[in-house]
Design a protein with these regions (language model features):
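A glycine-rich dinucleotide-binding beta-alpha-beta segment and adjacent secondary-structure elements
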Residues: 145-185
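A short acidic, glycine-rich active-site loop
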Residues: 2-10
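A short, structure-level motif marking secondary-structure boundaries and short turns
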Residues: 2, 116-118, 146
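Extended, hydrophobic alpha-helical segments in both membrane/secreted and soluble proteins
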Residues: 11-15
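Anion (oxyanion) recognition and catalysis
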Residues: 20
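An anion/pyrophosphate-binding glycine-rich loop and adjacent beta-alpha core
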Residues: 16, 25-139
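Structural core of flavin- and non-heme-iron oxidoreductases
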Residues: 23-30, 178, 183
């Protein structure tokens, strides 16, 4: 009744040492992120990009990755984010985009989300603002760069084509209707 990924006694870390010998680095994260795109603080937050395609920005307030809800895309992008900082950005119309992205399961995914948001905003784990500039200030990113990023992201939604990273049309969303939200990823 026990799973073992290696024969007993062979999990000694030799592969990690060999990787370091040829110049590899070791992540200084709280836990090995593997393929899961959430931080320790947001591991239970249902609006992480694992569940829905949202705008992802780095510490410069710029979009930096394909946000499709597929763990390897998100994890690779997040682990390579400048300054080890990234945010998932969305607006108050998230139920509409969730329904568009997941027509068969959106009701289940949205269950309890409003109450969860209230709790996480109160705890400081999720930021919210009625303005893009106010959200940028809370996130600590340059407001002008962030506003430009949001404007470009919204334009791609209107065009129905992601010309930057190729996110599928049905997975596109926009950041247009206040309040706006930022979740650390």
């Amino acid at each position: 009744d026990e799973n073992s990924y290696v024969p007993a006694g062979n999990n000694t870390g030799d592969a990690i040492l060999m990787t370091k010998w040829i110049g590899g680095g070791i992540s200084k994260s709280e836990a090995a992120p593997m393929v899961h795109p959430f931080t320790i603080a947001t591991r239970d937050c249902t609006m992480t990009p694992f569940f829905m395609t949202t705008l992802a920005v780095n510490s410069d307030g710029k979009r930096f990755m394909n946000e499709m809800p597929f763990e390897p895309y998100i994890t690779d992008g997040r682990m390579n984010a400048k300054g080890n900082v990234a945010w998932s950005i969305f607006d108050s119309d998230y139920p509409t985009y969730m329904q568009k992205q997941f027509p068969d399961s959106y009701e289940e995914k949205l269950e309890g989300v409003p109450a969860e948001f209230e709790e996480r905003v109160a705890d400081g784990e999720v930021f919210t603002s009625d303005t893009i500039e106010g959200l940028a200030e809370q996130m600590g990113v340059p407001a002008d760069a962030f506003a430009t990023t949001v404007e470009k992201f919204n334009a791609m939604y209107e065009q129905g084509k992601d010309t930057q990273f190729g996110v599928q049309e049905r997975l596109l969303s926009q950041v247009k209707t206040a309040p706006f939200y930022a979740v650390p990823i």
